[in-house]
Amino acid sequence: MKLIILDRDGVVNQDSDAFVKSPDEWIALPGSLQAIARLTQADWTVVLATNQSGLARGLFDTATLNAIHDKMHRALAQMGGVVDAIFMCPHGPDDGCACRKPLPGMYRDIARRYDVDLAGVPAVGDSLRDLQAAAQAGCAPWLVQTGNGRKTLAQGGLPEGTRVCEDLAAVAEQLLQEA
């Protein structure tokens, strides 16, 4: 199985300091849906791992989050792309959970669900916490320079072996060339 794990905000869609709180606020980044479609069509299983503390903060509810994800799934389907599963942490930063990135809990859940060893599985994010969680789980961290990615790159301290690409389309291109 060829598995790839993506962060959502800043990788697939535009990020917002005020959170993505409704389907109207969910706007795909240029080329991201096409990248997922290319990966899907090349037999990759695409999974999201996303912190959604807006739930804990009361900024939106589960029904709204599901509506946001429905919008994403519909847009992807039009291009032949599929996100097989969405793993998310609904907790706030101070809740003490094991699933909130930079902790690797969501990634370990993915490994159990798909019965895979995550060693070398590409995990794409735009923030240091995405990359830290991925590296702790044994994934190969990839930083995109969309969302908070440029700032993350400038701040340094990336996990060893982190690969850097302009955006998700460039990640997909690299992976498909290497396959």
Curated annotation (Swiss-Prot):
Coiled-coil residue spans: none
PANTHER family referenced in this protein's UniProt entry, alphabetically: D-GLYCERO-BETA-D-MANNO-HEPTOSE-1,7-BISPHOSPHATE 7-PHOSPHATASE
GO CC list: cytoplasm
Organism, scientific name: Bordetella bronchiseptica (strain ATCC BAA-588 / NCTC 13252 / RB50) (Alcaligenes bronchisepticus)
Sites marked Stabilizes the phosphoryl group: 50, 101
UniProt KW keywords: Carbohydrate metabolism, Cytoplasm, Hydrolase, Magnesium, Metal-binding, Zinc
Keyword Metal-binding: yes
Reaction catalyzed: D-glycero-beta-D-manno-heptose 1,7-bisphosphate + H2O = D-glycero-beta-D-manno-heptose 1-phosphate + phosphate
SUPFAM superfamilies (UniProt xref): HAD-like (SSF56784)
Chief place where the protein resides: cytoplasm
GO biological process, one term: lipopolysaccharide core region biosynthetic process
E.C. number(s) listed in UniProt: 3.1.3.82
GO MF entries: D-glycero-beta-D-manno-heptose 1,7-bisphosphate 7-phosphatase activity; magnesium ion binding; zinc ion binding
Protein name, UniProt field: D-glycero-beta-D-manno-heptose-1,7-bisphosphate 7-phosphatase
Sites where the protein binds Mg(2+): 7, 9, 126
Enzyme class: hydrolase
Entry binding sites for substrate: 7, 15-19, 50-53, 57, 100, 129
Positions contributing to Zn(2+) binding: 89, 91, 97, 99
Cofactor (UniProt): Mg(2+); Zn(2+)
Compartment(s) where it occurs, according to its Swiss-Prot or TrEMBL record: Cytoplasm
